[in-house]
Amino acid sequence: MKASQSFLATLKEAPSDAEVVSHKLMVRAGLIRKISAGIYNYLPLGLKVIRKVENIIREEMNRAGAIELLMPMIQPAELWQETGRWEKMGPELLRIKDRHDRDFLIQPTSEEVITDLARNEIRSYKQLPVNFYQIQTKFRDERRPRFGIMRGREFSMKDAYSFDRDTEGLKKSYQTMFEAYTQIFKRMGLEFRAVTADNGAIGGSGSQEFHVIADTGEDAIVYCPSSDYAANLEAAESLALNATRGAATQTMAKVPTPDKTNCADVAKLLNLPLEQTVKSLLFAADQESGPAKLFMLLVRGDHELNEVKASKVPGMTESRFATETEIKQACNAPAGYLGPVGVSAEVTIVADRTVANMADFVCGANDAGHHLTGVNWGRDLPEPLVLDIRNAVIGDPSPDGKGVVDICRGIEVGHVFQLGTRYSEAMGCTYLDQQGKAQPMVMGCYGIGVTRLLGAAIEQGHDERGIIWPISMAPVEVVICPMGYEKSEPVKAACDQLHDELVAAGIDVILDDRNERPGAMFADWELIGAPFRVVIGDRGLADSQVEFKGRTDADSQNIPLAQIKEKVISAVQAAKNAVA
């Protein structure tokens, strides 16, 4: 391919609304152009990267035994009403009507459609297991689209759905997909981690996320450097930091703490370590009738409540922060001075594991301007319900017992779920077993953010000059940069010959035959992220030499013209082997 026959649209400046590196570089490199908030045109080079990503995904999904199909982007509301998600999903679900006033939606995911397909097409256990996948456009009406394609509204996604006879079959399908995903991201040349995750709104019993490691990642990943343990912050287990509870050494006392409504200020006033304080948070869970049920959640003063874990406290699935009226009724004190001692008997006290093992701790006194010191379980207040409700922090003991945890940032690019029978039972998706009895199909679902992978790869691989693509994702593998293509017949002939030979060898090469200054030409391809560059000019040809340079090399090499083809092929193959 020649640059004059392609479409290069590089820019010197990034758009003013670009917040992250990937957004800035994708626009400047001519990969995308914004058409509306969270919606982008993919220019030829951007689409080429997408196609390379799709090809890797298809190859590994097919190798894992999955079967490709294509489901509609527009889906009828009736299917989503069967599972209750039509009502449950918020404004992220883009609902539309046709000319007959019938309700439809633009799919954000396809569990309902694939389950409908399976219930109509699969009858017998002999047809199971089966795993369908598609690569399709999705739409989620994000309230605030940001970070370019990383959190856009329209995006491309690979979603797969497995159907099995039983849970044991699901576990096998899940493991097969986990291994396929691992191979997909390895082939893409990305540094990534698979982490334990919460299933969230999609439901099911177990899931793992795949994160590309990047300092700019939205998600915190808790991992153990000494083992394979990894989980996202929402799901990471937090063990007690004190294995046993110490003996009480202080008498409980009420002390004045005027205008001190947070643990840090209280600890400073009382000249105590922050780790000796306890934070009290009051939540309310509305009931079908009668007053809301109240919960007081306790975490150590230097820790943060994990809201996902809190939502799993029995009775707190649908909860909210208590109102001022509810706080006054339960504690007779304003927020900032709440504590578990002397609260209404109607309040359920839930202590984090670390708090449950604390002695002589400090907490709110349920009296404005006062806190309690020397508080001890069993003596000053009843034993609490003990659960893991906090966020993990650096230095926590690893849940697998193999050291302590660290925390890094990551960008979620894949997620695998064990859905179970949530959708099949809701939609009557059954098969006849060997005894002729109807059984619900056991489902798994597996997603990869195709377009999101582009942004994640750039967040991980870039420098001050532009994008540093893994070889398997790069829009081109090699660029040939002539010094005077139209002015020198020897240069033109050498460039054309090398281009044709590399094409014949299966190398993805582009010959930049534009009438551009060398500096501008080099800057464009460093911005775009071509992994390898060959420079051919009259000066080098006089000595039968050309320049060869890798994108991350500090200096170029002089290579004999007769050897450059093999040098390029060898370098490209070595780069591919490094990520295979």
Swiss-Prot record:
Catalytic reactions of this protein: tRNA(Pro) + L-proline + ATP = L-prolyl-tRNA(Pro) + AMP + diphosphate
One annotated GO biological process: prolyl-tRNA aminoacylation
Protein biosynthesis listed as a keyword: yes
Stretches assigned to coiled coil: none
SUPFAM superfamilies linked: Class II aaRS ABD-related, Class II aaRS and biotin synthetases, YbaK/ProRS associated domain
Gene Ontology molecular function: any one: ATP binding
GO CC annotations on file: cytosol
Gene3D superfamilies: Anticodon-binding domain, Bira Bifunctional Protein, Domain 2, YbaK/aminoacyl-tRNA synthetase-associated domain
CDD domains according to UniProt: ProRS-INS, ProRS_anticodon_short, ProRS_core_prok
Subcellular localization: Cytoplasm
Enzyme Commission (EC) number: 6.1.1.15
InterPro entries per UniProt: aa-tRNA-synt_IIb, aa-tRNA-synth_II, aa-tRNA-synth_II/BPL/LPL, Anticodon-bd, Anticodon-bd_dom_sf, Pro-tRNA-ligase_IIa, Pro-tRNA-synth_IIa_bac-type, Pro-tRNA-Synthase_IIa_type1
Keywords: Aminoacyl-tRNA synthetase, ATP-binding, Cytoplasm, Ligase, Nucleotide-binding, Protein biosynthesis
Family, similarity comment: Belongs to the class-II aminoacyl-tRNA synthetase family. ProS type 1 subfamily.
Function: Catalyzes the attachment of proline to tRNA(Pro) in a two-step reaction: proline is first activated by ATP to form Pro-AMP and then transferred to the acceptor end of tRNA(Pro). As ProRS can inadvertently accommodate and process non-cognate amino acids such as alanine and cysteine, to avoid such errors it has two additional distinct editing activities against alanine. One activity is designated as 'pretransfer' editing and involves the tRNA(Pro)-independent hydrolysis of activated Ala-AMP.
Quaternary structure and partners: Homodimer.
Comment text on domains: Consists of three domains: the N-terminal catalytic domain, the editing domain and the C-terminal anticodon-binding domain.
Full protein name: Proline--tRNA ligase
Source organism (scientific name): Polynucleobacter asymbioticus (strain DSM 18221 / CIP 109841 / QLW-P1DMWA-1)
